[in-house]
Amino acid sequence: MAFPQELAIVIQKEMEKLDLKQVKIISDNITNKYRNESGKNRSLINKEIEALVYSAVRMPATYEAVSSVLDQTKKLYSKECKSLLDVGAGTGAATWAACNYFNIEKIVCLEKEAAMEKIGRKYMREGHRAIQQAE
């Protein structure tokens, strides 16, 4: 399923405020952190600007990966999902994807990185009612 237009627009607006060289440096740093520090119980995204860059660089691919899984799940699982618990929600890619596949009424997002949670909540204000009301 295609990346939501309203989400792409809000990410683009946020990214327009940033310097392209700075985005490249931050993107490279994020990639290195994920390659070298994942699974070591370290904070990988500490600053809001890192969460913004993460959302522009990685969120669309995460959204597509989750969408692919949900597409297969929906084919195999006939029941309608009404609630979602998104553990490690990041900036909300899985939440957005799930809401495009199921009629989600209640969402709880858990994210340990404050910067990721802040950006995710900002983006969720652009979503439909259940996304806007996510806890």
Regions found by a protein language model. Give the residues of each.
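Class I SAM-dependent methyltransferase Rossmann-like catalytic core
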Residues: 42, 47-66
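Conserved alpha-helix/loop element of class I SAM-dependent methyltransferases that forms part
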Residues: 60-80
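Conserved SAM-binding loop of SAM-dependent methyltransferases across substrates and taxa
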Residues: 91-104
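Conserved SAM-binding strand-loop segment of SAM-dependent methyltransferases
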Residues: 128-135
